Amino acid sequence: MKKLLISAVSILVICLGMLYSRDFIDSSNSGDKQTLTIFNWGEYIDPDLIKKFEEETGISVVYETFDSNEAMLTKIQAGSTPYDIVIPSDYMIKKMKKLNLLKKLDHSKIEGFDNIDPQFKDKSFDHNNEFSIPYFWGTLGILYNKTKVPEDLTFEKWNNLWDTRLANNVLLIDGAREMMGIALQSEGNSVNDTNEVNLNLAERKLELLHPNVKAINADEKKMLMINNEAWVSVVFSGDAKAIMEENENMVYALPKEGTNLWFDNIVIPKTSKNEEGAYKFINFMLRPENAAKNSEFIGYATPNTKAKELLPEETTSDEQFYPDLESFGNRAEVYEDLEKKMLQFYNDLFLKFKINNRK
């Protein structure tokens, strides 16, 4: 057994190191201008871009992740971490504006905003992009294994999920807005419906889906689909693309009843202690080569027209992932910010469905 001999000098060095580390952490938390704290979805940026940003700017990035808009909001409201960059979804941006949690953007400091396709600017959740810059966009649809499902099932309708031939082979997203929205759209209603009768009927329809449900999960669905352990999955478009790259038998479909059209944008919360660094990051991500690299790595559609030109034509011409939004009309719906009581009603109904699914 080796003996560890520590001299007095060694102890002094260790103590000084600990003090330095503590001072560094304290300086980061107090707003050290050389640190940028980013709060983002998991696996939602190319790690090489973070390294590139650090090398170009000398700014050290502290990167934290969340798994839902609601979890992100709770952390922001707690105010314990001075986040400089956050990437929430459409309806949550509107809510955060109402709660006075976001800094109004100074567009004179933003370079490359002209690269953003006009159809992704000035959306209802943030008019004139006063508080947010487009990051990614996409749809919610159905991914299926063409070698496993019956040939007559092409999933042009949400109702195909209820086909009895899919017993124990359907994966669902663990999200109240998503799953309640699917049930609502399958009956010709809006994903933002607030009629309690319609919502109760939607939950009852979800109950009828129990025999087909293999699992209600998040990231696990990727491996289950890649390994042919499930035939069908409700997925976001970027996840579908990632799975299709690993399994050539997969097809992504957008039901004709409608889809959730979502947008994730970059915002600067009022907790930010490095606003200058935040603008540098926004400008960095707006550069076409960086936006294109990020889109290729993540798999989601970029709103950056200059970046889109740098992507393979086989990707940008694929209507599964770059659909013609005008052809959807009002059937491509963006989630609205529901009042707290109504959102809880959605959550309670979905929880009821999940509990009954375990029986």
Residue ranges: model-predicted function:
Residues 1-4:
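Positively charged n-region of N-terminal signal peptides that target proteins for export
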Residues 7, 19-95, 108:
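Early extracytoplasmic/lumenal segment of secretory-pathway proteins
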Residues 82, 87-93, 97-212, 217-229:
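Extracytoplasmic ligand-binding site segments that recognize negatively charged/polar headgroups
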Residues 92-95, 226, 231-249:
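A ligand-binding cleft/hinge motif common to bilobed small-molecule-binding domains
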Residues 97-105, 127-130, 243-254, 317-319:
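Ligand-binding "clamshell"
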Residues 199-208, 246-270:
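Periplasmic-binding protein-like
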Residues 269-330:
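Mature extracytoplasmic/periplasmic domains
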Residues 326-359:
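Conserved C-terminal helix/tail region of periplasmic/extracytoplasmic solute-binding proteins
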